[in-house]
């Protein structure tokens, strides 16, 4: 089985300089949805590109065969541009880059039905209002497709529409492609004409209208996003996740969340995030591409491409940047920013700190206002803080530097040299007190 994805259109009605198939749906480009699904049912996947072909090509996996339709002259013409992809002894599935939610199950049903002996298998659906769609007309054992504009009056009551998804026998498709003409109002070559050449046609019906919805406008894309969002939320609710306010909660379809986790309002969980069991997320929190363990609490914070182990507390108003690893039972408090750093088990950074390019051991206390000065104007340098160290408030650790195990840094210090284990590091001027100085100064004035 081969799958050919037609994705050459510009998407004029999207009013965008970005190719239509690259517009994201639930966090990933529409074409990525289709290619991933195609890869689950077909041994080889090809994509026909057109507008901004090179830009779209960059988003595709290396295992996808790419063909280019220089001039968009219809669906059959697009398939003709990929005729080298079609093998006489193999079947080919036709998909569309702007119909992103076609399901693996439906495609498998089509393939199974096709293998009962067919030139072509059509995916159809019944619509209450089929206006604008080509109708699938059955005449005994045969089927044909008539475009809406060409329907005679007596057939306008037919509600079975052609979705545009097909499985073709490779032999049949190669034979009929040269016979398709562009004798229509638009002067284009339509794949529906190939169906009308077929002697053996089989039909599969879908009742899920989401999976056959094509995106031609931003309005449709937003509608599809909302439907997908609510479908995901309902799935999570049914599997033991509490979502206190679905109307203000945005969860991408790729997200996984364990049971007994509570999601508060105004929470955004995106990308390939996995959240464990019995967590509390939000309110007003954004999490992107993170791995989160069990019993984690994150509130009013942002977390990007980070790993958060069990029993960790984050926030409020914390920011975890890419490369952050929070080990078990660590605590990250308000207005703490962490970037490309590992925070050890049981370590606390509770207030007003920046930790960048650092490796922090177990049970370290990082006082309020601590800064790792990691950038020297040319490159980022590492800071090492070993187990059990205590960093006093308002300290600056100028990297590269190492704070030894059990060492103590006095508050207000600027540390530029390594501090050995169990040592006191001070990097500040001695305090001077001049008694009565203020009164003396006033008398002089």
Swiss-Prot record:
Pathway: Nucleotide-sugar biosynthesis; UDP-N-acetyl-alpha-D-glucosamine biosynthesis; N-acetyl-alpha-D-glucosamine 1-phosphate from alpha-D-glucosamine 6-phosphate (route II): step 2/2; Nucleotide-sugar biosynthesis; UDP-N-acetyl-alpha-D-glucosamine biosynthesis; UDP-N-acetyl-alpha-D-glucosamine from N-acetyl-alpha-D-glucosamine 1-phosphate: step 1/1; Bacterial outer membrane biogenesis; LPS lipid A biosynthesis
Residues annotated as binding UDP-N-acetyl-alpha-D-glucosamine: 6-9, 20, 69, 74-75, 96-98, 134, 147, 162, 216, 321, 339, 354, 365
Family: In the N-terminal section; belongs to the N-acetylglucosamine-1-phosphate uridyltransferase family. In the C-terminal section; belongs to the transferase hexapeptide repeat family.
Record's GO cellular component terms: cytoplasm; membrane
EC number(s) per entry: 2.7.7.23, 2.3.1.157
Main location: cytoplasm
InterPro entries attached to this UniProt entry: Bifunctional_GlmU, GlmU-like, GlmU_C_LbH, Hexapep, Hexapep_transf_CS, MobA-like_NTP_Trfase, Nucleotide-diphossugar_trans, Trimer_LpxA-like_sf
Renumbered residue ranges of the record's region Linker: 219-239
Protein name: Bifunctional protein GlmU
Cofactor names: Mg(2+)
Co-factor binding details: Binds 1 Mg(2+) ion per subunit.
Lineage per the UniProt record: Bacteria, Thermotogati, Thermotogota, Thermotogae, Thermotogales
Residue positions binding Mg(2+): 98, 216
Record's subcellular location: Cytoplasm
Catalytic activities: alpha-D-glucosamine 1-phosphate + acetyl-CoA = N-acetyl-alpha-D-glucosamine 1-phosphate + CoA + H(+); N-acetyl-alpha-D-glucosamine 1-phosphate + UTP + H(+) = UDP-N-acetyl-alpha-D-glucosamine + diphosphate
Binding residues annotated for acetyl-CoA, in chain numbering: 368, 374-375, 393, 411, 428
Keyword terms, alphabetized: Acyltransferase, Cell shape, Cell wall biogenesis/degradation, Cytoplasm, Magnesium, Metal-binding, Multifunctional enzyme, Nucleotidyltransferase, Peptidoglycan synthesis, Repeat, Transferase
């Amino acid at each position: 089985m081969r799958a050919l994805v037609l994705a050459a259109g510009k998407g004029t009605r999207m009013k965008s300089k970005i190719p239509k198939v690259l517009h994201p749906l639930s966090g990933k480009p529409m074409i990525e949805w289709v290619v991933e699904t195609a890869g689950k049912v077909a041994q080889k996947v090809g994509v026909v590109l057109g507008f901004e072909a090179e830009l779209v090509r960059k988003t595709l996996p290396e295992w996808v065969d790419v063909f280019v339709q220089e001039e968009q002259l219809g669906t059959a013409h697009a398939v003709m541009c990929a005729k080298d992809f079609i093998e006489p002894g193999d079947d080919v599935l036709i998909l569309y880059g702007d119909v992103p939610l076609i399901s693996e199950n439906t495609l498998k049903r089509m393939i199974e039905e096709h293998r009962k002996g067919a030139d072509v298998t059509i995916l159809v659906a019944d619509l209450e209002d089929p206006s604008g769609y080509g109708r699938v007309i059955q005449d005994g054992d045969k089927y044909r497709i008539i475009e809406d504009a060409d329907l005679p009056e007596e057939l306008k009551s037919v509600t079975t529409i052609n979705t545009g998804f097909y499985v073709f026998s490779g032999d049949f498709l190669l034979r009929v492609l040269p016979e398709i003409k562009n004798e229509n109002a638009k002067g284009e070559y339509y794949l529906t004409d190939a169906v009308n050449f077929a002697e053996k046609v089989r039909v599969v019906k879908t009742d899920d209208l989401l999976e056959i919805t094509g995106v031609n406008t931003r309005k449709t894309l937003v509608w599809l996003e909302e439907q997908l969002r609510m479908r995901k939320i309902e799935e999570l609710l049914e599997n033991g996740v509490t979502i206190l306010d679905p109307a203000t909660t945005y969860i991408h379809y790729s997200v996984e969340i364990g049971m007994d986790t509570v999601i508060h309002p105004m929470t955004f969980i995106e990308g390939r995030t996995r959240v464990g069991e019995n967590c509390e997320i939000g309110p007003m929190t954004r999490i992107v591409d993170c791995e989160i363990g069990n019993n984690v609490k994150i509130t009013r914070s942002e977390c990007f491409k980070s790993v958060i182990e069990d029993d960790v507390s984050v926030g409020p108003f914390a920011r975890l940047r890419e490369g952050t690893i929070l080990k078990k039972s660590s605590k990250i408090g308000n207005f703490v920013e962490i970037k490309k750093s590992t925070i050890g088990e049981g370590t606390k950074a509770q207030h007003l700190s920046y930790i960048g390019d650092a490796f922090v051991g177990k049970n370290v206390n990082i006082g309020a206002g601590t800064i790792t000065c990691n950038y020297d104007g040319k490159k980022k340098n590492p800071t090492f803080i070993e187990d059990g160290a205590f960093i006093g408030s308002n300290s600056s650790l100028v990297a590269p530097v190492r704070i030894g195990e059990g060492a103590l840094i006095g508050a207000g210090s600027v540390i530029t040299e390594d501090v050995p284990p169990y040592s006191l590091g001070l990097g500040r001027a001695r305090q001077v007190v001049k008694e009565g100085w203020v009164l003396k100064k006033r008398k002089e004035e």
